[in-house]
Amino acid sequence: MAELTTLARPYAKAAFEHAQAHQQLANWSAMLGLAAAVSQDDTMQRLLKAPRLTSAEKAATFIDVCGDKFNAQAQNFIHVAAENDRLLLLPEIAALFDLYKAEQEKSVDVEVTSAFALNQEQQDKLAKVLSARLGQEVRLHASEDASLIGGVVIRAGDLVIDGSVRGKIAKLAEALKS
């Protein structure tokens, strides 16, 4: 995974800098999101891995599938990625682009996993507290996992806060083993 990120980073950075310079961050985010989804299709993956096709043929087919959703610069980006055999990295490129975009917009996506469903009031309160702690606008994404037993696990970028009962039991078990 780290290797994929290393390979994808220059492409994501170049796309981000171009989009930022032309004030098209949202447009490029949408185009890269579409490209990532298309590249994950099983049929498209087989095509992209086919050794008998040239990079130009792969790029042309990829662009044809996406239709008129790509502007000329995005089509050029796909051609460059194809020439360097990086079309399969599009999901990672799109994820990094969105990370750069979120940093630029001073916002962060926060994944909150709880043992039980959080109501809207709880989500709003949690988002407000996290926004104050992180100093950024928080976009909260809530999910449930009954195996947590109780509590929540919060993931915001590299930050992980494990306030789950399962996590506390695991820490206790580790302490008892020591």
Curated annotation (Swiss-Prot):
The keyword Cell inner membrane applies. GO terms for cellular component: plasma membrane; proton-transporting ATP synthase complex. Coiled coil: none annotated. Keywords: ATP synthesis, Cell inner membrane, Cell membrane, CF(1), Hydrogen ion transport, Ion transport, Membrane, Transport. Gene3D superfamilies: N-terminal domain of the delta subunit of the F1F0-ATP synthase (1.10.520.20). It is a peripheral membrane protein. GO terms for molecular function: proton-transporting ATP synthase activity, rotational mechanism. InterPro entries: ATP_synth_OSCP/delta_N_sf, ATPase_OSCP/dsu. It is found in: Cell inner membrane. F-type ATPases have 2 components, F(1) - the catalytic core - and F(0) - the membrane proton channel. F(1) has five subunits: alpha(3), beta(3), gamma(1), delta(1), epsilon(1). F(0) has three main subunits: a(1), b(2) and c(10-14). The alpha and beta chains form an alternating ring which encloses part of the gamma chain. F(1) is attached to F(0) by a central stalk formed by the gamma and epsilon chains, while a peripheral stalk is formed by the delta and b chains. Belongs to the ATPase delta chain family. F(1)F(0) ATP synthase produces ATP from ADP in the presence of a proton or sodium gradient. F-type ATPases consist of two structural domains, F(1) containing the extramembraneous catalytic core and F(0) containing the membrane proton channel, linked together by a central stalk and a peripheral stalk. During catalysis, ATP synthesis in the catalytic domain of F(1) is coupled via a rotary mechanism of the central stalk subunits to proton translocation. This is ATP synthase subunit delta. It comes from Pseudomonas putida (strain ATCC 47054 / DSM 6125 / CFBP 8728 / NCIMB 11950 / KT2440).
